[in-house]
Amino acid sequence: MSKNNGKGAKGEFEFPQPAKKQTFSEMIYNPQEGTFFGRTGKSWSQLLLFYTIFYIVLAALFTICMQGLLSTISDTEPKWKLQDSLIGTNPGLGFRPLSEQTERGSVIAFDGKKPAESDYWIELIDDFLRDYNHTEGRDMKHCGFGQVLEPTDVCVVNTDLFGGCSKANNYGYKTNQPCIFLKLNKIFGWIPEVYDKEEKDMPDDLKKVINETKTEERQQVWVSCNGHLGKDKENFQNIRYFPSQGFPSYYYPFLNQPGYLSPLVAVQFNSPPKGQMLDVECRAWAKNIQYSGSVRDRKGSVTFQILLD
C-alpha cells in the first residue's frame, strides 16, 4: 500500500507494532527501562515529595481552621444561650420513674402486693436518685432562702426531706401510694421569675399553699398536679409534695457548675383509684414559663398515667 504525499513521492505505510506484553514481574520492575510499577525512581521521588507537601499544607489549613473554631467555644458555657439558642428560654418539665420499655409509654402500672411489679419501679427510681444519694467528694452547700450565694455555688438536694417518698418507704410503691419525681430541664443561665402571690389560673390547693407560705420562702417555681383536661378531680384531693410544692429559686441559674444536680419535687398519690387509669397532668408555674397543654406542642407541663391493678 502506498500513498502520494502531494509532491509525487511515494512511501510505504507501516502499521504500528503491537506493544510487547509484559510479564507480571516486569510490571513490578522493568530492568530495561529501570521502572518500578511503571515509574522511575526519580518519578516516584517527585510524586512522594508532591503529596508530602500537599498533605502538610492541608493539615496546616485544617489545624488553623480548627483553632479558629475552638477559640470561639468555651469549655464551660455554650456560645448561644437562652433566646439565641435552639433550646430557648422555656424549660420543660420531666418526671421519673419512666420505663425503659417503650411499649409502656408514660403509664406506671403495678400492684403493690406483687413484689415483682413494685420492685420494677423502685429500682428505676433507685437508679435515678443514685447521684443524689452519693454526693461524697463534691463541693456542695446546704442552701436556704435569703442566703447569699455565689454564682458557682452548688446546692444539695436533700433526699432525707422526701418524707413518704423516701427510699426507706420504698417510694410508696409497696403500699399503693406511689411517688413521682418532677424536675425541670436544665437551661444554661435561666433564672425563674417566680409568683410570690396567687394567680387566678392556679388551682385552689396551690393558691392556699402560696398564701400559707412565708413571704421570703415564696421564691419558688411552683408545681401542681391535677387530672389531665380537668378529669378525675375527685382523685386529687389526697396528694402530697416533698420537700415543698416547688423548686426553690436558689438552685438557679444553672451555669454548668461541677456536681450540679437539678432540684426535685416528689409527688405522692396517697389514694389513687384501683382498676382505673388515673390521667395526671403536672404543671410548673413561673412568669417566664409558658404553658401549653397541647399534645403536639406541650410546654411547661408533663402528663403520665397511674394504674393500680
Curated annotation (Swiss-Prot):
Gene Ontology terms for molecular function: ATPase activator activity
Cell inner membrane in keyword set: no
Tissue specificity note: In embryos, it is expressed in the neurons of the CNS and PNS, in Garland cells and posterior spiracles. In adults, it is concentrated in the thorax and abdomen (muscle tissue, digestive system and Malpighian tubules) and weakly expressed in the head. Expression is diffuse in the nervous system.
Swiss-Prot/TrEMBL GO biological process terms: intracellular potassium ion homeostasis; intracellular sodium ion homeostasis; monoatomic cation transport; potassium ion import across plasma membrane; sodium ion export across plasma membrane
Bridged cysteine pairs (disulfide): 143-155, 165-179, 225-282
Glycosylation sites: 133, 211
Family matches, as PROSITE patterns: ATPASE_NA_K_BETA_1 (PS00390)
Keywords: Cell membrane, Disulfide bond, Glycoprotein, Ion transport, Membrane, Potassium, Potassium transport, Signal-anchor, Sodium, Sodium transport, Sodium/potassium transport, Transmembrane, Transmembrane helix, Transport
Subcellular location: Cell membrane
GO CC terms of this entry: plasma membrane; sodium:potassium-exchanging ATPase complex
Side of membrane Extracellular, spans: 67-309
Subunit: The sodium/potassium-transporting ATPase is composed of a catalytic alpha subunit, an auxiliary non-catalytic beta subunit and an additional regulatory subunit. Interacts with nkain.
Record protein name field: Sodium/potassium-transporting ATPase subunit beta-1
